Amino acid sequence: MQDIMTLATPLEKLHGLRNQDDEDFLDGSQSVYAPRICSVQPGHTEEEILQLHRKHVGHFVRISENEVSVSHPDAVKQILQANIAKGTFYSMFSLPDYHYINQMSELDPTRHIQKTRNLSAGFSLSNIAKTEPYIDTVLQLFQTRLNELSDSATPVEFQNWFSFFAFDVLGEVTFSKSFGFVQSGTDIRNAIANTGSLVYYISIIGNYVWFHYLTLGNPIFSRLGLQPNSHIFDTCLLAIDSRKKNPEVRHDMMQRWLDVRATHPERITEQDIFGAAVANIGAGAETISATAQAVVYYLLQCPEYLKRAQDEIDAAQARGELSPLVQYSEAVKLPFLQACLKEAYRFHPAVAHNLPRVVPKGGMTIAGRYFPEGVLVSVNPWIIHRNPDIFGPDCDTYNPSRWLQGETKKMDAFLIHWGTGYNQCPGRNLAQFELSKVLTTLLRDYEIEQVNPKNEWKFETRFLAVPYGWPCKIRRRQRG
């Protein structure tokens, strides 16, 4: 049973927002209150808010005491792409505590942009390409484990295996050290489960940041090792300490950051490096897992798309264009496979949460609606991605072909699964890199079907929308 907690407040109590002549604003004058929904038990805040926007044909829906969800297309440029401060919700992402401010948790746009510049070398596509041999080490082991599961007819829980793969790849690329998840085939020290619990905690306590500073955000908790994902933190700390003692240069992210520190110590501290490493892994792995699952799941729901994707891959294989360990440069030349991935970004964005910004001094006007200084205005990728004016009348269906038909620039401009503007995800190049490789490998080498084809997957919106509960049978494909 879905149990939700809501905060219903008439808009007229929020000074400066009431305008009863404006039907585009869902407010108290319509006897409908907009809920602020927290997933205490399994719930779908993204669908709740989407339906409020649609039901009342409103671009503006109040979702908390001081926050308005905006679905108008102009919101992407005026809110997310503007250099205005983020809401305090983001400070929850300082891990392991508030001393470690990373790009995600930095609220001030100027300081955020400076951090991005200092860390950008590690995230560049050219640097990630140099780490491909490390990614291949994990990919090869991943193939071995899938072969074992295939040979033993053991059902595959992709929510686990994609997470294992993503965490280990991120460990290798960030500081050349795998976490060992794929090797063990288990969630070591419950690190992944605890990461999910932490995201759940953030989705609720993010509304009460002061409480976070008294509990998990308090440095005392991290010093005592009471953080829920200590395996991730411990591995990061050991890797940084080992790298400082080891003069060997590796082409990983940490080496690039250490190079910046050696040349310009005033620009980047060890805390910055540790914070960036933890954020890269903690925020990156589950978003990659959610997206990989979305591609496979929706291809299974649409057999014609699955066949088309595998036919494209088989043709490339027959032409000798795919290596035993698929290279990124090969995978990006598969247009339908890339369209399937892009459609998964749209149809099931891993971040399905409203992204808040603070209206600056002097207020701002969005689509004719004035918002006073200090009000939170937020945009949800899930809602923008289901706008029929942007993505067409079939926006509620998974259709990779939309990305191969005619002009796609308008859709590209509103594809915000990695965010946009100064707060765009710094790890997006790496995510695209490893997703392209692992999905091509999976579809080339295995036949996949759900154990119970009639059962739908499950997911809850807890900032991230990471699916689970759709076990699959796999078997090695026989190619001519």
Outline where the language-model segments fall:
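Cytochrome P450 C-terminal beta-domain/meander region
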Residues: 55, 59, 65, 262-266, ...
